[in-house]
Amino acid sequence: MNAFPEDPGGAREEPAREGGDASPSHVTPPGSAGLGSVPNDVLTGPLLEIPRDPAWSGLDVVRLTVLSIVALFVGVFTVLFIAHFWIDPHSPLLSLARIPLVVVAGQALAYLLILGYMVVLVTRERGRPDFLAAIHWNWPTSPAVYLLVGILLSIALQLLASRLPIPKHLPIDTFFRTPAEAWVLAIFSTTLGPLMEELFFRGFLYPSLARGIGLPGAVFLTAAAFALTHGSQLLYSWGPVLVIFLVGMVLTMVRAKTNSVAAGLLIHVAYNGTISTMMFFATDGFRHLEKLNQ
């Protein structure tokens, strides 16, 4: 029995008719039924071009990566200058850059810019008017299944992390100094954050790699890239990076199995949401964040 619902858009083979002859001489090739009634000019005309899947190339993904890095700098610096000139003109830029709310706001702005370019790349540059179809969004018929998988995955990997060497203090901890910062990160990590990560890694990167090197290599490299992207927040410590790598493996395998980016998004949201919920209760509603370091 499959762990996940089958792709609703997938093709199914029709069973052979009872008593029918399944020999090749009696089988009509796909698309050849009724050819005798088709005009000759149709048969001799130019062949219809099969749409490229994915519509983008590896170079497009490289360009998207570079532009994403540029957008992150633009987004953070834009918010930084706004905070400096209109909110707190007396604080130096360097001190404002250490404020988690400024960083998250800049990252959110950058993500919106990146999302806009993703749509332009697919619909305008590659001629696919249906963006969601092109990236294989495919909202699953049983979303609760994937939410449950995300919750169980989060609990299981938190148990694993408790047995791994985790540094006492990580850069990500600076985002949990005040209740406001904790709330903002909790909301961001269950909305725009996982959406953009799934669009990039499972929507754009994975299918491009799968076409070039095959499914196993694409799953591994996508998960590795996903983990390395989070490495700076974790001091590249092998324990927490391994946990993120395993998350990436599960998300990418679900993408490969279900042909659905949305399925992975549901798991990702539930995974992050479970961690945020655990932290919420462990710190009395984010009011006693010092308990996280005890």
Where are the regions a protein language model picked out?
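Interfacial segments of alpha-helical transmembrane regions
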Residues: 132-152
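Residue-level signature of transmembrane alpha-helical entry/exit and packing/kink sites
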Residues: 57-65, 96-108, 142-147, 181-186, ...
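Residues in flexible loops and secondary-structure boundaries
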Residues: 9, 121, 139, 143-145, ...
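Transmembrane helix-loop-helix hairpins at the membrane interface
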Residues: 151-294
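N-terminal, membrane-interfacial amphipathic/helix-forming hydrophobic leader that caps
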Residues: 1-134, 162, 276-294
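Alpha-helix capping and helix-coil boundary motifs
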Residues: 90-92, 126-130, 143, 178, ...
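Helix-boundary and loop/linker segments of multi-pass membrane transporters
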Residues: 53-57, 92-96, 136-140, 172-181, ...
